């Protein structure tokens, strides 16, 4: 969980004291509530290397992964295999498992279980490949542009999870040729606990890709209250239901900060800090069976460092008691 931006309090106070308490329903238009998912998506776009009109802030990462996998499957007629990493964040695997359980003809293959590499698992049956930019447990940074190229050469679509990279590493969704992407906002984008996630759909897919969770916010004319669903144009069709306005307001400050920094400089500083941390831990804790789990090469490591040790949870609690915030996994 990222730290709270100073302006987040101002945004939330205004949303509660003025927009909600005084203006009530008129704030959907006057305060821009209705367009917040789109407005914030436009702010996130340059942070992850996306052109305008390709990102919407909406729902959770899990729901957005479900939407994008289903959409990608529908675009891959005649193919029925999903490929992911066995070491992916568990919710990603659960979503894929749920899809394969609901559709008996869809199969799942995992790198690390069904094969040692993506190349081993790619064939004419593969519809979708979904990988994380940075491994949630080890911090390993994957060569996404290379993986996307191999995926496309096999005729499949690529979905990228940017949860552990957006806002702290250079991300180039358009340049890399990613088809769909998802990401959370409460880590390096400092959106606060439970802040909404985001979803990216490359412009080339938007007129044919369909959201499987068709709700009124994704309707072409939501206030016409028509009986039948007609998808909105472009990225807006990937909205589903009413969004959490207060959480969106809190998120805005964090994204605005991310827009003002040079992520190449952030990356370099992160590499120096993580390298220093590794060296200090190995120097001072070498006799306590502490083993580095992250790559030693800073170019292959994200912005996190992971160590394995006995009684890890107790150690983390002791650190927290001393106001040193760490995470146990």
Give, region by region, the residue ranges found by the protein language model.
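Pyridoxal 5′-phosphate
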Residues: 1-329
């Amino acid at each position: 969980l990222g730290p709270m931006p100073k302006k987040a309090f101002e945004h939330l106070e205004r949303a509660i004291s003025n927009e909600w308490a005084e203006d009530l329903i008129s704030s959907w238009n006057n305060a821009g509530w209705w367009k917040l998912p789109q407005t914030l998506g436009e702010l996130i776009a340059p942070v992850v290397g996306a052109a305008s009109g390709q990102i919407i802030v909406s729902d959770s990462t899990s729901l957005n992964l479900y939407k994008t996998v289903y959409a990608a499957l529908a675009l891959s007629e005649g193919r029925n295999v999903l490929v992911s990493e066995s070491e992916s964040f568990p919710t990603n695997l659960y979503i894929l498992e749920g899809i394969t359980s609901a559709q008996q003809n869809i199969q799942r293959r995992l790198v690390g279980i069904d094969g040692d590499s993506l190349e081993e698992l790619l064939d004419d049956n593969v519809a979708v490949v979904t990988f994380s930019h940075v491994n949630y447990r080890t911090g390993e940074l994957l060569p996404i542009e290379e993986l996307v190229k191999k995926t496309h050469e096999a005729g499949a679509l690529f979905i990228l999870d940017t949860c552990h990279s957006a806002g702290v590493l250079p991300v180039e969704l358009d340049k890399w040729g990613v088809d769909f992407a998802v990401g959370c906002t409460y880590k390096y984008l400092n959106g606060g606990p439970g802040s909404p996630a985001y979803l990216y759909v490359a412009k080339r897919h938007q007129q044919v890709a369909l959201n499987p969770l068709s709700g009124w916010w994704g309707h072409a004319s939501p206030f016409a209250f028509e009986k039948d669903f007609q998808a909105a144009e472009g990225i807006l069709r990937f909205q589903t239901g009413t969004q959490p306005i207060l959480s969106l307001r809190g998120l805005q400050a964090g994204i605005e900060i991310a827009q003002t920094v040079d992520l190449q400089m952030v990356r370099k500083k992160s590499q120096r800090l993580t390298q220093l941390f590794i060296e200090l831990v190995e120097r001072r804790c070498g006799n306590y069976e502490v083993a580095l789990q992250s790559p030693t090469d800073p170019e292959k490591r994200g912005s996190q460092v992971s160590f394995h040790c006995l009684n890890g949870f107790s150690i983390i609690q002791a650190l927290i008691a001393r106001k040193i915030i760490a995470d146990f996994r």
